[in-house]
Amino acid sequence: MNYSVPFYHVFVFMGVSGSGKSTIANAAAYHLHAAVLDGDFLHPRDNIKKMSSGHALSDSDRYPWLKAINDAIFAMQSTNKLSLIVCSALKKSYRNILRMDHSNLSFIYLKGDFKTIQERLQARKGHFFQSQMLITQFATLEDPGNDEKDVWLVNVNQSLQCVINATIKIIEDVIRSHIEESS
């Protein structure tokens, strides 16, 4: 696909921890030659310590992190034709913070059932997220509604390759529709 288009676009990979956000974003970035940023790297030190000790973040904990990701979206839209960012974006209010001042932004919602995600988290090594916090994340999660036209759903209760392929197709389709609209 040719990405020499007159606009820049960022896709945020959202969902609970264990849904495959980083894995899918990295695979899609490789295939599409896109820049990729894991939003976890933008968490303030206190947030990382809090999560590492097994405590969930409050909205006030998340706000500076979400603002940092919003700034990263601006920077990436200024320098890359196609960028992918990993961020849980569990609530509509969080997604709205990310949307502020960004028209070329879409979300890829990696959705899975609790049992599948829990099994993935229990098998994961070297991540500060504690699997017992999954219950809290599912309770916090606000599924995007019909009013969020910039959110695309991918079911992660299928093979990794199927999820990657579905995600790449969505990104290509969104870009293609923008090209057609600008023609």
Model-derived regions: residue spans:
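The conserved Walker
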Residues: 17
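Glycine-rich phosphate-binding loop used to anchor ATP phosphates in small-molecule kinases
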Residues: 60-102, 110
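Conserved phosphate-donor/acceptor-positioning beta-strand/loop module used by diverse small-molecule
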Residues: 101-120, 154
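Conserved substrate/cofactor phosphate-moiety recognition/catalytic segment
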Residues: 26-71
